[in-house]
Each structure stands twice: as C-alpha cells, then as structure tokens.
C-alpha cells in the first residue's frame, strides 16, 4: 500500500470496525470488517481483537494505523473510558496496540477523529475560523478546530446544563428514552447550541452521529448565528479521520527521526532501553554508596583498634 493509504479502526462498546482508507479520495479503500467487541472489553482482549482485524487485511508492514477511541487521550494514554472497561484508564493505548500489532498505531479521541475527517473531506473542508463538530448519540462528542487546527479532548458534551451534564439533557439517546418528538428535541438542542455559541462564537457547527441522517427534521428549527450543517461522512468519519491522523503523525515521526525511516515503535524501544540503563545506573549508584559506607565503617574500626593498641602500650 502507498503513502496515500492508512488503516483506521473504530472501537465501540459493541463492535470494532476497520478498513484501509484511501487518503486521496477520503473514503474506505475496501469494505470494512466488523468484529464484536469482547466482553469484558479489557485492554488485553481488545488489543487481541484489533490484531485479528488488521491481520484479516493484506496490510504492508509500513502502513500506520489510526484508532478512534472512546476516551480522553493525552500523549497516547487513556485518561477516561466510555463504553469500554474502566481498566483502560491509565493505559498507554498507543504503546499497547503498537506492540501487539507490529504497526505504528496512533490513538485519538473518537469525536476528534470524526472532526478531522469532516475538516479534511466533509462539511468543514473549506471552513475557516472556529469550527465545532458535534456527534449526537448515546452521549455528545465534540471536536473543536481553530483555523484548521484541532483543540483535542474538548468534551463539550459535559458542560453544565440544567444542573447536570448537557448530554444527559439533549443527547439523541435522551430523545429516544423520553420519547421526545423532533420539535421537543430541537428545543433542547437550541439551549445547548446557544450556550456553545455564547462560549466559543463558532463560524460553523457540524452535526454528526447516526441521527444526522434525519437532519431535516430538527436542524431547520434551530435559530443560531452560525450556520449549522449535517456531517457528510457519517458512520465512516471515525475510521477516515483516524487514518488521516495516523498518516500525518507517521510522516512527522519519520521527519523528526531525520528521514531515516525510523518508526515510533523503534523510538519506543530506545526509550525502554534508556529506562533500563537509567535503572541500572541507579542500581550502580546505590551499590557504590553502600561500598563507600562499608569502607568508612572498616576505616573507623581500624582507627579504633589502633587507638586501643596505642593505649595498651602506654
């Protein structure tokens, strides 16, 4: 596969989907494959499923993998966990998947991945200024962009509204649970997006998630300063966006390594080796300290014995 290809894997609570992505066209290069998410969805079990999924495709060794993940991700580490086992919190997801699959893996918050796809190939591709992508589903995911640059992990579905997290008041799952009609739901969306406008003054708002296919039933009822439009890539957005991120990150990693083709996994190995060497040096220092302490004790003992002998002679 060429440098215009990367692999995307979308990890959800019930299914793990993946496919190679054509980064020129901004679409899946083949049909995607779906494997049920293992239960419990522990790091080890999910990593094994990700490996199986990748091996189901003819993926060249140098092709990077992007993974949208339902969590706040900082420097590859999961800080939260939604719809997956809580044992993910504190896990270095990048390192785990890279080690398990043999590919360089780059993990990103799932809403951020969808936003990246829309900014590259969808509703936000010509947008300037502040753009907010929202995904309406079980909860509310958000991705914020300023002049095309992602502000990661915004989690604006959790801003307070009516004394609780906003998503508990206006997510699509709430519409279904409370059996709200489209107009009733639009009233709640109006409250949420009005608050978002007050805080961020976006130039464009993009609405994604499965319910975006019904956008004509509720978006025209919203009265906002900013244009609000449906997402274009829908269910493929996460896979495509993560693949875009993976290819960009891989190219940056290679450039930072001096263009010698050295991958993140190699750098990670160097890091691990450096850690071991540091640990060994620490151990050597402790041993030296102990030896010096013993030498001092022996020296004091010798001086004491010499003093006794001298007194005895006198």
Feature locations, PLM:
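Asparagine-centered polar/low-complexity signal
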Residues: 83-84, 109, 235
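Active-site glycine-centered loops adjacent to acidic/histidine catalytic or metal-binding residues
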Residues: 110, 137, 242
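Active-site-adjacent loop/helix segments that line or gate small-molecule/cofactor pockets in enzymes
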Residues: 111-115
């Amino acid at each position: 596969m060429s440098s215009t290809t990367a692999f995307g894997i979308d990890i959800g609570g019930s299914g793990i989907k993946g496919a190679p992505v054509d980064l020129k066209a901004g679409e899946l290069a083949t049909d995607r494959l779906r494997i049920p998410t293992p239960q419990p969805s522990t790091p080890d079990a999910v990593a094994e499923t990700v490996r199986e999924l990748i091996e189901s495709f003819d993926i060249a060794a140098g092709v990077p993998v992007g993974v949208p993940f339902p969590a706040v991700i900082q420097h590859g580490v999961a800080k939260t966990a939604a719809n997956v086992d809580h044992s993910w919190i504190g896990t270095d997801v990048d390192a785990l998947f890279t080690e398990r699959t043999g590919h360089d893996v780059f993990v990103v918050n799932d809403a951020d991945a969808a936003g990246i796809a829309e900014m590259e190939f969808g509703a936000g591709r010509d947008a300037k200024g502040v753009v907010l992508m929202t995904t309406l589903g079980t909860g509310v995911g958000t991705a914020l962009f300023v002049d095309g640059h992602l502000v990661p992990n915004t989690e604006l579905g959790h801003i307070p509204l009516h004394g609780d997290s906003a998503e508990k008041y206006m997510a699509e799952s709430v519409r279904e649970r409370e059996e709200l009609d489209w107009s009733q739901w639009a009233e709640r969306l109006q409250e949420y997006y009005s608050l978002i406008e007050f805080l961020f003054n976006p130039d464009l708002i993009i609405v994604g998630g499965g319910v975006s296919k019904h956008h004509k039933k509720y978006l025209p009822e919203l009265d906002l300063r900013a244009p609000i439009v449906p997402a274009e890539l829908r269910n493929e957005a996460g896979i495509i966006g993560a693949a875009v991120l993976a290819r960009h990150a891989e190219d940056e990693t290679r450039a930072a390594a001096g263009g010698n083709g050295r991958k993140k996994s190699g750098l990670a190995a160097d890091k691990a080796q450096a850690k071991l060497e540091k640990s060994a040096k620490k151990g050597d220092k402790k041993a030296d300290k102990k030896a010096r302490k013993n030498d001092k004790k022996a020296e004091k003992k010798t001086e004491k014995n010499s003093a006794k002998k001298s007194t005895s002679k006198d």
